[in-house]
Design a protein with these regions (language model features):
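Interdomain hinge/linker segments and adjacent boundary elements that couple functional modules
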Residues: 1-38
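PLD/PLD-like phosphodiesterase catalytic module centered on the HKD motif
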Residues: 1-4, 14-15, 37-145
Length: 145
């Protein structure tokens, strides 16, 4: 198989890999994260989202929108098309050529899997697109809160 898959556990290496993923996104960037990760997305890695949007990358973001993360989600709407999915678990993102998946402990990512294996990237893109169809627009969910 072409490409490689790496498992990272060092916090600095994880952040570096996320930034590389952000910089490498060319056309699409799809993220599906649990309700606690939007704070991370508008904190340590927000610049990468904003830069990708400026490059014309289509960013789609799925999370469970709650009262606790509502302010973060409103900020995410400035750089991504945001949708809500009840009970979403896990954290992954997929772009044109890469896939990343993180494991959290509290507010920190403690493990990150990063892959450029084309078959895995395509598989994760299809999973995201299936979840996207099942999710509802953020504005609809925010009206319920």
């Amino acid at each position: 198989l072409a490409g490689e898959t790496r498992v990272l556990t060092d916090e600095k290496e994880i952040l570096k890999a996320i930034i590389e993923f952000q910089e490498n996104a060319r056309q699409i960037w799809y993220a599906c994260v649990d309700s606690t990760l939007p704070s991370f997305s508008v904190g340590r890695v927000k610049e990468g989202y904003v830069a990708a949007k400026k490059r014309g990358v289509k960013i789609r973001y799925i999370t469970e929108i709650t009262k606790d993360n509502l302010m973060y989600c409103m900020e995410i709407m400035n750089f991504a098309e945001l949708r809500h999915l009840d009970g979403v678990k896990g954290n992954f993102a997929v772009s044109d050529s890469e896939y990343v998946s993180g494991v959290k402990d509290g507010d920190s990512l403690v493990t990150l899997v990063k892959s450029t294996v084309e078959e895995l990237v395509q598989q994760q893109r299809l999973i995201f697109e299936t979840l996207w169809i099942q999710s509802v627009p953020a504005s609809e969910r925010m009206g319920e809160i």
